[in-house]
Every structure is written in structure tokens, then in C-alpha cells.
């Protein structure tokens, strides 16, 4: 069986979108997916990088085009339940800690699915945002 390592941050809308497509790939191709939660903000900091919305802030139409591409992806894969979390960007540290516990207890994949749906579909999880100074 083929395996895929999927590194993701719950706080990223792309994680939700990719997760939904990965579920279809798993079903259709019988691929095993190893979900690996990461803190994307920590990776940005460690690599002296910035999130796209900051990095390309001054580049005319870059963020608008990125949003257009996201919308095209959503339409192509019929991911119509996706909703942009109004508190984006959110802090995902506690969620990732929960993922570690879920993995130890043997239900990581279910945990990931539920959290991503609640962050980017039902909008039941609206953690503190880095913008409001709470953690």
C-alpha cells in the first residue's frame, strides 16, 4: 500500500481543503495517509518567513489571486461546506496538543476530521486570534 505523509496546521484553511480531497484519494486509490500536525507559525518563524497574507501584502492583486485560486479549488472539488473562519488566523497550539493525545489513544484521524470540520465548515471552533493578544 502506498503511503503519504501529510504535514498540516489545523489553523490553515488549506489543511481543511486538502484533508477533504485526501479523503477522496484514500477511498479511490487505497492510499494510507500519515497525518502529521505542525505549527506553521513556528515553521515560518524558524525559516525567517511570513504567511502569504503578510508576505504578499504589498504585491498588487497577489492575495486577491490567491483567493480566486482557493475558490476555484473549492468549486473543482465540490467543497461547498467550506467557510472562512472569521477569526483567522487562529492559534492552533492547544489543538495540536489534543492531536497528540488523540494519537496516543488511537483516534487521531477522527479527531483531525472533527476539528477541521468545526474550524472550517461548522465554525464551532473560534480560538483566540493572535490579533487579540489572547492565547
Segments the model singles out, each with a brief description of its role:
Residues 2-17:
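Local sequence-structure signature of Cys/Sec-based thiol-disulfide redox active-site neighborhoods
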Residues 3, 32-36, 135:
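Solvent-exposed, well-ordered amphipathic alpha-helical segments
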Residues 13, 37, 128-130:
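Proline-centered helix-kink/hinge sites
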Residues 15, 43, 135:
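Conserved protein kinase catalytic core
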Residues 20-119:
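Structural alpha/beta surface segment adjacent to cysteine/selenocysteine redox centers
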Residues 125-135:
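Single conserved hydrophobic/aromatic residue that forms the stacking wall/gate
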Amino acid at each position: 500500500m502506498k503511503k503519504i505523509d501529510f504535514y498540516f496546521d489545523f489553523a490553515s484553511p488549506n489543511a481543511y481543503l486538502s484533508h477533504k480531497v485526501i479523503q477522496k484519494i484514500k477511498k479511490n486509490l487505497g492510499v494510507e495517509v500519515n497525518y502529521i500536525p505542525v505549527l506553521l507559525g513556528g515553521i515560518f518563524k524558524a525559516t525567517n518567513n511570513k504567511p502569504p497574507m503578510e508576505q504578499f501584502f504589498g504585491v498588487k492583486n497577489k492575495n486577491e489571486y490567491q483567493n480566486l485560486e482557493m475558490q476555484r479549488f473549492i468549486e473543482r472539488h465540490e467543497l461547498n461546506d467550506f467557510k472562512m473562519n472569521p477569526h483567522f488566523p487562529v492559534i492552533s497550539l492547544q489543538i495540536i496538543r489534543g492531536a497528540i493525545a488523540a494519537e496516543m489513544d488511537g483516534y487521531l484521524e477522527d479527531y483531525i476530521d472533527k476539528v477541521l470540520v468545526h474550524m472550517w465548515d461548522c465554525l464551532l471552533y473560534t480560538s483566540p486570534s493572535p490579533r487579540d493578544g489572547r492565547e
